[in-house]
């Protein structure tokens, strides 16, 4: 057998192993959530479970995609056609629609160059041990420190290739010296966003983050397809995926649902720490934030789906905390406000 054929077979085997690991990981996550949901909502009926398996097999190409469909059904109370499972999104949609270029969104030091937006709260960057101002001009270490704290007592540092709040550091002037700068990885320094007053009652110790998901349509236009508000806990200095509370947003009005979801997807009607109800809260500047994200996505048509983490400041202006086209999970929005991605043809991508 030729060496090229052997390499091809080895690559195919490695891809199969990778896919099976992905399925197994998603199945474990989905099964944990389903068990939690069934504690509060009762067991998911056999007919619904059968619908999920049949739909996964017949429409999405494999019954292995059924676990997330069961979770969505448990949240919704019935099965709905058109849902996209989390592992199908990761294994099929992302490679087809975002490709390798989606990884660029995880390089935070590159974001401003790509988006060219004043909505980014970037102050400076650290790249290969060298400091750069927001316009990518080189600055010395002492000048960089002065620049970072020219207007703020504390700033945020986010390493490249980090997501879900991992690796974030909150730094004061006393925390940074030329020596400590030399030990930091590549990353972006951002100024803190003073959130709109309406969020202070919900999460006073961390900045509430609006997760907006935009998708490219078959005609090339871009639409907002999902939205929810992410809130930190009392002990969190920033919103963390492991502890956050998520509240769906009605996209037509920008109004919060009356119920939010804990990390185990148990539903609550108010923030567990502050006691503030979610009812009748309208996100300030919601439609302007959505329009901005759609406009920026339109200018970056290489990507089929983008998750945007947005903070709303005191003036109702949207600030881009992160964008993600590589690890932007869709399972929460699918379970709560979905199906969010109908009429895009995603359910047929596996046939390519």
Which stretches of residues belong to each language-model region?
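Intrinsically disordered, low-structural-confidence terminal and linker regions
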Residues: 1-29
